[in-house]
């Protein structure tokens, strides 16, 4: 039996089912998952739950064996609240550059560009 303290291998991870966060990379594009972007080797994993909002899946996660790929700070916050358990894996995620999600019509709007710059500056200070 595998120890809970040893990181899970990709082979072992692929035996489990995922709760996947889905999103579109651009308007009209097919949905992709955070799992597929962060861990390309896990692309073939079984998805038992797909959602566009990870918060809606948290209660399901806490009462199931589903695995969900989340940003580290989000996972830490949910784990500290006792809502999820963090499972270490041998695979390392692809480094992601954070992006703000904006509707394509507001992308060039000067006021929205200013709002994004304020958010970006604030995020760099923390």
Where are the language model's segments positioned?
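Acidic, proline/serine/threonine- and glycine-rich low-complexity intrinsically disordered segments
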Residues: 1-5, 45-47
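A late-sequence structural motif
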Residues: 4, 20-21, 85-126
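Short secondary-structure boundary/capping segments
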Residues: 10-11, 39, 76, 90-92
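Conserved short hydrophobic patches within well-ordered secondary structure
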Residues: 13, 19-21, 66-67, 78
């Amino acid at each position: 039996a595998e120890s809970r303290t040893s990181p899970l291998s990709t082979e072992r991870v692929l035996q489990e089912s995922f709760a996947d966060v889905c999103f579109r990379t651009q308007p009209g594009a097919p949905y992709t998952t955070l799992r597929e972007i962060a861990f390309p080797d896990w692309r073939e994993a079984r998805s038992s739950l797909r959602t566009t909002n990870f918060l809606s899946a948290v209660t399901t996660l806490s009462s199931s064996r589903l695995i969900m790929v989340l940003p580290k700070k989000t996972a830490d916050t949910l784990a500290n609240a006792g809502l999820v358990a963090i499972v270490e894996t041998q695979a390392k995620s692809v480094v992601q550059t954070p992006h703000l999600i904006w509707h394509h019509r507001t992308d060039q709007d000067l006021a929205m560009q200013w709002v994004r710059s304020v958010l970006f500056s604030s995020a760099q200070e923390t």
